[in-house]
């Protein structure tokens, strides 16, 4: 009789455990999902602090160079163009930028939300902010996330801009930045 109670008790415990884990999994709180989050060290196969071999210089400032890499190690299908900000002296990467200017407004907003969702699942952010202004020109919807070690990302959709080089007036941008990138919080308002 005593052993039957133990078996029934174990079965009930197992059922409750199964239900509990199923609920946690459906809410996105399962312990394995939390363990899979990684630190932000780069994007598209580029790593912060690394030197880039092949690139075309787009602009130069006192401390920075903006370059377009000739080879993308891990391209993303949403991104049409890539740019890197390099320290002018060391030629090391401080920012990684991906751009797409062929989306319609609704597509841009949807792609931005998908990117934000994916980024939040992948990385731990200590600080996040969102900015949405769809009333005034240029319209914008921006997400900012920064980790405890000050690496971060800005994902934005800017609309009604009026590009000279494109038929679209919409820009999807994703900017990954290292702590060495100055004024990272100002990226929200650029």
Model-derived features with residue positions:
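Sec-dependent signal peptide recognition
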Residues: 10-21
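N-terminal secretory signal peptides that target proteins for export/translocation
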Residues: 1-11
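Non-cytosolic coordination micro-motifs
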Residues: 31-69, 100-190
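C-terminal motif of bacterial Sec signal peptides marking the signal peptidase cleavage site
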Residues: 25-26
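Compositionally biased P/S/T/G-rich terminal and signal peptide-adjacent segments
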Residues: 68-92
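Acidic/histidine-rich, surface-exposed loop or edge segments in extracytoplasmic proteins
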Residues: 92-102
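Intrinsic-disorder-associated interaction segments
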Residues: 13, 86-89, 108
């Amino acid at each position: 009789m005593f052993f039957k109670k133990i078996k029934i008790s174990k079965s009930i415990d197992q059922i409750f455990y199964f239900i509990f884990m199923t609920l946690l999994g459906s809410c996105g709180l399962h312990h394995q999902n939390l363990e899979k989050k990684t630190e932000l060290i780069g994007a598209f196969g580029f790593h912060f602090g690394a030197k880039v071999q092949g690139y075309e210089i787009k602009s130069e400032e006192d401390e920075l160079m903006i370059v377009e890499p000739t080879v993308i190690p891990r391209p993303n299908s949403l991104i049409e163009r890539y740019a890197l900000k390099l320290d002018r002296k060391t030629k090391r990467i401080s920012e990684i930028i991906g751009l797409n200017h062929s989306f319609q407004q609704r597509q841009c907003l949807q792609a931005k939300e998908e990117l934000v969702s994916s980024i939040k699942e992948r990385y731990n952010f200590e600080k996040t902010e969102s900015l949405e202004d769809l009333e005034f020109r240029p319209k914008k919807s921006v997400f900012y996330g920064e980790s405890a070690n000050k690496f971060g990302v800005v994902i934005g959709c800017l609309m009604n801009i009026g590009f000279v080089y494109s038929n679209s007036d919409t820009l999807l941008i994703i900017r990954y930045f290292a702590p060495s990138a100055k004024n990272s919080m100002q990226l929200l308002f650029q």
